[in-house]
């Protein structure tokens, strides 16, 4: 029987199957952070249980850490309690922790790939919705709830249904200033934020094939914004090159054995997908969200859509509501929208390639005096690499604040947030109401577009600038 990549990974991890279609899957890697794990550990104590596989469990502090100080007190009492609990839990249950003093501390979905913890063919879970990021390596990865975190800690397994298969083939020629962020935002806008509900999405096509691993991670990171359980990209030579000599990657003879296995991780010819999309990105422009959902997105030269253009009454009502919240009027050009803050960071766009692309725009330039801008490297490793290349100096000289690693302004869970009615150009993954702070207004963009917004104080078309 011909199988998709998803089916191969799923089937190879089945420990037990039930007649109702549910299976118990073995989990290869369990990633933890300070927010969704405390209750799970406490429940283990109450039940007098241990962690089944401490060596397959890794933890970091990221969601509510301060990006201005390594002081555990800096983000408030609740954040302090959560971080203290993580320290206590990891020590008691013998789990490796990337705490505030660890040189490689950072965002969970950044540090795991760069350390070689994330490998093709794995089943990976984390109490965070953007665990789909790891699918870029051909790993079946998805977010789980706190009760499921407890179950994986105790058993190293998880009950899961079998999802349907979707293929999104991305074809065409990538234009000037078009990044992986623009590609995935365009796809979300094209097919909608619920198109992937009930599916695992496999991304393929010549555009995906040419992407670096960091670009692929951006694409898979936002598969969840299509409503999918996760996203996948088959591993190839680009994957192997990225993983070679990483700290936790296989070494020596094990490396060759691993590659032999990884080469089998591809969808078989004539395998059946339940739904297929072919999307040509040849003529797309840099993308900017205008509403309160990632699928409310348009090209930089476009206007906020007129409500009458929506034939679907639900989408029409959502557009009206979004415009009211975002304080935008239909017919307004994106390039006429001014902003207050710029955020470059998050598990979507805080890797070294993201920082390099933004720094090229900012070099020898100064940001608008009306804009406050911060750049937050995704990990200690990214931060050191950027500093060794002098990128920190470029950002600082342009007027950005150069911060410590963390989730930062992606979510209003730490000190980095929007004030009431502030408008932000953000490289994060969600623009929901209040996501970056109470009544804050979020526009999702690529690092290039964020850098341009900082320079001009408004959204700008890079194709029309010198």
UniProtKB/Swiss-Prot annotation:
Its EC number is 4.2.1.33. Binds 1 [4Fe-4S] cluster per subunit. GO terms for molecular function: 3-isopropylmalate dehydratase activity; 4 iron, 4 sulfur cluster binding; metal ion binding. GO terms for biological process: L-leucine biosynthetic process. Pathway: Amino-acid biosynthesis; L-leucine biosynthesis; L-leucine from 3-methyl-2-oxobutanoate: step 2/4. Its cofactor is [4Fe-4S] cluster. InterPro entries: 3-IsopropMal_deHydase_lsu (IPR004430), Acnase/IPM_dHydase_lsu_aba_1/3 (IPR015931), Acoase/IPM_deHydtase_lsu_aba (IPR001030), Aconitase_4Fe-4S_BS (IPR018136), Aconitase_4Fe-4S_dom (IPR036008), IPM_dehydratase_rel_enz (IPR050067), IPMI_cat (IPR033941). Keywords: 4Fe-4S, Amino-acid biosynthesis, Branched-chain amino acid biosynthesis, Iron, Iron-sulfur, Leucine biosynthesis, Lyase, Metal-binding, Plasmid. It catalyses: (2R,3S)-3-isopropylmalate = (2S)-2-isopropylmalate. [4Fe-4S] cluster binds at residues 347, 407, 410. The keyword Magnesium does not apply. CDD domains: IPMI (cd01583). It is an enzyme of class 4 (lyase). Catalyzes the isomerization between 2-isopropylmalate and 3-isopropylmalate, via the formation of 2-isopropylmaleate. Belongs to the aconitase/IPM isomerase family. LeuC type 1 subfamily. PANTHER family: 3-ISOPROPYLMALATE DEHYDRATASE, HOMOACONITASE, MITOCHONDRIAL-RELATED. Heterodimer of LeuC and LeuD. This is 3-isopropylmalate dehydratase large subunit. It comes from Buchnera aphidicola subsp. Diuraphis noxia.
